[in-house]
Amino acid sequence: MNLKLQLKILSFLQFCLWGSWLTTLGSYMFVTLKFDGASIGAVYSSLGIAAVFMPTLLGIVADKWLSAKWVYALCHVVGAITLFMAAEVTTPGAMFFVILLNSLAYMPTLGLINTISYYRLQSAGMDIVTDFPPIRIWGTIGFILAMWGVSFSGFELSHMQLYIGATPSVLLVQLTFTLPHIPVANQQKNQSWTSMLGLDAFALFKNKRMAIFFIFSMMLGAELQITNMFGNTFLHSFDKDPLFASSFIVQHASVMMSISQISETLFILTIPFFLSRYGINNVMLIS
C-alpha cells in the first residue's frame, strides 16, 4: 500500500472512533441514562486524568522496550473492549470506571500515531512539516464523518454510538499488522526518571512567554472539554420547546457541532504556508 495512503487511513480511523462518541456521549448519559451534570463531568474528567500521565508512561515503554506499533495495537485492543463494555453500562460509577480505562488506552495513541507517522515519513526521506499536515487532516475528516454518521443514523442518544466507536479500534489493530517494523529508540538509557517522565519541562514556566502560552492552552483545553461535554446536550435540550423540537439543529446536533472540526480542517491545510511565511509567533498571534 502507498505510504501516504496507509498513514491517511491510520489517521482517519484514529479520530473516526473518537468522533463517534466524544461529543454525543454526554447527551446519551443525560437524556437516555438520566445521569446528572456532576456525573457526566466526572466521566469526561477521566480523559484529562489519563492524559496527564499515561502517554508519558507508554512513551517510555515504546522508547525502551516495545516497538511503538505494538504498543499502539495493544492500546486499541483495550480501547475496543472498553467501548463494548461502556455500551452496556447504565450507572454513573461504572461508566466513569470504564471510560477511564478507555482513556488510559486511547490517550497514548494520540502521540504514538504521530511517532509512527513521523518515523515512516522520515524513513522515506519526506519532510514532516510539509507532508504530515495533509495526512493529519484525514483524522479530522474521520472525526467529522463519524459525527455525521452517528447523527444521521439516529444514534446520538443511543448506546450504539459506542459500538460504532469500537469498530475503528478493531480495524486499527488489524492495520497495525501491515505496518513495517519500527525499532525501539532506546534513547533514554542515561536519562533520569525526572527527564523520562517529562517533569523537567516544568522549568519552562520560568520563561514568562512560555508560562503565558501554557496557561492560555489550558484555558482553551477547559473550554473545549465543556463544549464536548454539554454542547450537544444543550442543543438537544431545545426539543422540549415545540417551536424547535423538529428543527434540523435539534434533531442533528452533531452536524451543527461539526462546524468546529470543519474549521479545523480548513486551517490545518494552511499551516505549512503560514508557518513558512510568517513564523510560529505570528501564527499564534493570528490564532
Predicted regions and their residues:
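Juxtamembrane intracellular "pre-TM" segments in multi-pass secondary transporters
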Residues: 1, 179-215, 240-245
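Helix-loop boundary and gating motifs at the non-cytosolic
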Residues: 1-51, 209-245, 252-254
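Hydrophobic core of transmembrane alpha-helices in multi-pass small-molecule transporters
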Residues: 12, 82, 92-111, 116, ...
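Central cavity-lining transmembrane alpha-helices of secondary-active solute carriers
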Residues: 42-60, 255-270
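Helix-to-loop junctions at the C-terminal end of transmembrane segments
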Residues: 53-67, 154, 266-280
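Structural signature of the two symmetry-related core transmembrane helices
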Residues: 70-84, 282-287
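Cytoplasmic helix-loop-helix junction between adjacent transmembrane helices
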Residues: 100-138
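Symmetry-related core transmembrane helices of the 12-TM Major Facilitator Superfamily/SLC fold
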Residues: 161-178
